[in-house]
């Protein structure tokens, strides 16, 4: 199974768990015990692919916890299953410097095998064939510069992207724009909005 967590949306509680309200004592002294989050229990009890997305957008506290998890394969007393694999993603690439991300220091990067993945327009068209309506696929195929913005990004301005084309297709399909009786003017207006 795949266990996915978006590090940018995690808090320390999402990473470590929350304290148990039951009173616990160890050798006669009060102690706090923790209820581990479900994803961590799963990754510790069975082999999974643990996918951590947007690690470079996580808070520093969460990143430090992920650092321990990836370095020692344990956190807060929980040990990952021996066959659990960890894969993480960051926002990089040619435009990575224009995203609001935290820079990863050499000690963090040293814990990973790093692959730079830059999908081409051909890669996207291959994926999109059959995933999006043919009219949009044909448009992108014949107007490839419209797939994704090139150049610098201005703040608060929306640009075309692979994700936005997929969302556009999903939205237009949900209102029947692509059917035989579809409103082609609406199709154009949605695409240029």
Name the predicted role of every residue range.
Residues 1-142:
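AAA+ P-loop NTPase catalytic core and its hallmark functional loops
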Residues 113-121, 184-193:
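Hydrophobic transmembrane alpha-helix bundles
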């Amino acid at each position: 199974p795949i266990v996915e967590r978006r590090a940018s949306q995690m808090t320390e509680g999402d990473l470590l768990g929350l304290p148990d309200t039951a009173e616990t004592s160890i050798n006669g002294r009060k102690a706090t015990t923790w209820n581990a989050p479900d994803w961590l229990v799963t990754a510790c009890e069975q082999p999974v692919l643990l996918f951590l997305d947007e690690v470079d957008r996580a808070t520093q506290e969460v990143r430090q916890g992920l650092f321990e998890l990836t370095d020692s394969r344990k956190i807060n007393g929980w040990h990952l299953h021996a066959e659990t694999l960890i894969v993480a993603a960051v926002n990089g690439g040619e435009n990575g410097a224009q995203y609001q991300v935290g820079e990863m220091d050499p000690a963090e990067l040293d814990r990973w095998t790093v692959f730079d993945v830059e999908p081409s327009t051909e890669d996207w068209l291959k994926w999109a064939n059959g995933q999006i309506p043919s009219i949009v696929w044909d448009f992108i195929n014949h107007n490839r510069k419209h797939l994704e913005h090139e150049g610098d990004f201005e703040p608060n301005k929306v640009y075309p992207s692979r994700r936005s084309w997929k969302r556009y297709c999903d939205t237009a399909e949900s209102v029947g724009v692509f059917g035989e009786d579809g409103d082609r003017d609406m199709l154009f207006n949605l695409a240029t909005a």
